[in-house]
């Protein structure tokens, strides 16, 4: 019985060795034909953690789970009219430029306001802007920018405004069933691999439409077919909620609105998380407002009555004064922001310690030098 088992083990080992050799030969052949790195074991990849770029909003970074938009992926931002979709995308543009990257904006709606973009922190002198005449042209321009590998972020505003050339050349009332969906499906097939290879973030803004004859369930849908839904790694549903009233002389004036951003699809972290942000008219997302709220919930900022305090020192009476204090003291803002990100695991503790060490190393060293001027100095000829 033992001999039979040993013989069986020898056959299995021999068969396993042959399979291993055949696999190695196949891997060598693939690398020879398609280049090194065309196939590899997943554990051999230099980067296994998903690289991300901050969305420009702390609350949204937390909701996304990974700490921002994943690089080399497609993002879809959709919602009702005037809900803040373009504002969310422009904050991503500003963040990309802040990190030293290059951003492009495909304005298919021909409605980008440069002054508003500048107010959100976008460097409009460096922003690449295209206002295409047709959907095919807009997607072709986006494809060439992505293929170059030199652009970090491409925003398309919006999918609904990417009108196929055949529809533009035709008459109003002509039927073009599925034309835009086919165009988007082909674009996703062409752009998907290039986006991942170049680590470009592609943000597609989309509108909402109503399905006809839906009696049960959600009648809302997004134009452009199903391809974008499948290819997108992250889908964000942006909805405006209650209006925000001003203070003092503006107490009866709407100065902004609370906006809920729901992550309805997420391939890099758990989905269905929500972020509540304050979008102030003419200013964009209130970064100080969301930081005060989140840090207070975590007791990083302490609240007693109407007073807010940090590290035992009062920073303002009422949330508006606390926001103003953080806006006037960017170093304290960054310190609190860092603590919040560490708490939610957006920054590893080791990285946090390293960054603090770098700060200490960068601090100027002041040495006291005492000169004794009582002694005479003799100079020999």
From Swiss-Prot:
<dbReference type="InterPro" id="IPR023400">
    <property type="entry name" value="RecA_C_sf"/>
</dbReference>
<dbReference type="GO" id="GO:0005829">
    <property type="term" value="C:cytosol"/>
</dbReference>
<comment type="similarity">
    <text>Belongs to the RecA family.</text>
</comment>
<keyword id="KW-0238">DNA-binding</keyword>
<dbReference type="InterPro" id="IPR013765">
    <property type="entry name" value="DNA_recomb/repair_RecA"/>
</dbReference>
<keyword id="KW-0227">DNA damage</keyword>
<dbReference type="GO" id="GO:0006310">
    <property type="term" value="P:DNA recombination"/>
</dbReference>
<dbReference type="InterPro" id="IPR020584">
    <property type="entry name" value="DNA_recomb/repair_RecA_CS"/>
</dbReference>
<dbReference type="InterPro" id="IPR020587">
    <property type="entry name" value="RecA_monomer-monomer_interface"/>
</dbReference>
<dbReference type="InterPro" id="IPR020588">
    <property type="entry name" value="RecA_ATP-bd"/>
</dbReference>
<keyword id="KW-0233">DNA recombination</keyword>
<dbReference type="GO" id="GO:0009432">
    <property type="term" value="P:SOS response"/>
</dbReference>
<keyword id="KW-0547">Nucleotide-binding</keyword>
<keyword id="KW-0963">Cytoplasm</keyword>
<dbReference type="GO" id="GO:0005524">
    <property type="term" value="F:ATP binding"/>
</dbReference>
<dbReference type="GO" id="GO:0016887">
    <property type="term" value="F:ATP hydrolysis activity"/>
</dbReference>
<dbReference type="Pfam" id="PF00154">
    <property type="entry name" value="RecA"/>
</dbReference>
<dbReference type="GO" id="GO:0006281">
    <property type="term" value="P:DNA repair"/>
</dbReference>
<keyword id="KW-0742">SOS response</keyword>
<keyword id="KW-0234">DNA repair</keyword>
<comment type="function">
    <text>Can catalyze the hydrolysis of ATP in the presence of single-stranded DNA, the ATP-dependent uptake of single-stranded DNA by duplex DNA, and the ATP-dependent hybridization of homologous single-stranded DNAs. It interacts with LexA causing its activation and leading to its autocatalytic cleavage.</text>
</comment>
<dbReference type="Pfam" id="PF21096">
    <property type="entry name" value="RecA_C"/>
</dbReference>
<dbReference type="GO" id="GO:0003697">
    <property type="term" value="F:single-stranded DNA binding"/>
</dbReference>
<keyword id="KW-0067">ATP-binding</keyword>
<dbReference type="GO" id="GO:0140664">
    <property type="term" value="F:ATP-dependent DNA damage sensor activity"/>
</dbReference>
<feature type="binding site">
    <location>
        <begin position="79"/>
        <end position="86"/>
    </location>
    <ligand>
        <name>ATP</name>
    </ligand>
</feature>
<dbReference type="InterPro" id="IPR003593">
    <property type="entry name" value="AAA+_ATPase"/>
</dbReference>
<protein>
    <recommendedName>
        <fullName>Protein RecA</fullName>
    </recommendedName>
</protein>
<dbReference type="GO" id="GO:0003684">
    <property type="term" value="F:damaged DNA binding"/>
</dbReference>
<dbReference type="InterPro" id="IPR049261">
    <property type="entry name" value="RecA-like_C"/>
</dbReference>
<dbReference type="InterPro" id="IPR027417">
    <property type="entry name" value="P-loop_NTPase"/>
</dbReference>
<dbReference type="InterPro" id="IPR049428">
    <property type="entry name" value="RecA-like_N"/>
</dbReference>
């Amino acid at each position: 019985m033992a001999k039979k088992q040993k013989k069986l083990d020898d056959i299995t080992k021999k068969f396993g060795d042959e399979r291993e050799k055949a696999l190695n030969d196949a891997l060598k052949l693939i690398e020879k034909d398609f280049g090194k790195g065309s196939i590899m074991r997943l554990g051999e990849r230099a980067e296994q953690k998903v690289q991300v770029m901050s969305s420009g909003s702390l609350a949204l970074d937390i909701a996304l789970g990974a700490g921002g938009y994943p690089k080399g992926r497609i993002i879809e931002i959709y919602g009702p009219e005037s809900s803040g979709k373009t504002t969310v995308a422009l904050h991503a543009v500003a963040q990309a430029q802040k990190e030293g990257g290059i951003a492009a904006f495909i304005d298919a709606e021909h409605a980008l306001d440069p002054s508003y973009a500048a107010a959100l922190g976008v460097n409009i002198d460096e922003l690449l802007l295209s206002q295409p005449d047709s959907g095919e042209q807009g997607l072709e321009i986006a494809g060439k920018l992505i293929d170059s590998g030199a652009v970090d972020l491409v925003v398309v505003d919006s999918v609904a405004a990417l009108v196929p050339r055949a529809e533009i050349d035709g008459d109003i009332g002509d039927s073009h069933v599925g034309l835009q969906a086919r165009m988007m499906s082909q674009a996703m097939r062409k752009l998907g691999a290039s986006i991942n290879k170049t680590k470009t973030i592609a943000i597609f803004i989309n509108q909402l439409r109503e399905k006809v004859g839906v009696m049960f369930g959600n009648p809302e849908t997004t134009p452009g077919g199903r391809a974008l839904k499948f290819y997108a790694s992250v889908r964000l549903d942006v909805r405006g909620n209650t209006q925000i009233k001003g203070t003092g002389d503006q107490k009866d004036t709407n100065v902004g609105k609370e906006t809920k951003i729901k992550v309805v699809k997420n391939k890099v972290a758990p989905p269905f998380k929500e972020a509540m942000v304050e979008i102030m008219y003419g200013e964009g997302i209130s970064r100080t407002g969301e930081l005060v709220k989140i840090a207070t919930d975590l007791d990083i900022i302490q609240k007693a009555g109407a007073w807010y305090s940090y590290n035992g020192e009062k920073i303002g009476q009422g949330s508006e004064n606390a926001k103003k204090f953080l806006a006037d003291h960017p170093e304290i803002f960054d310190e609190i922001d860092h603590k919040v990100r560490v708490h939610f695991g957006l920054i590893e503790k080791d990285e946090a310690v390293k960054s603090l060490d770098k700060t200490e190393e960068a601090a100027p060293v002041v040495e006291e030098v005492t000169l004794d001027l009582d002694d005479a100095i003799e100079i020999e000829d």
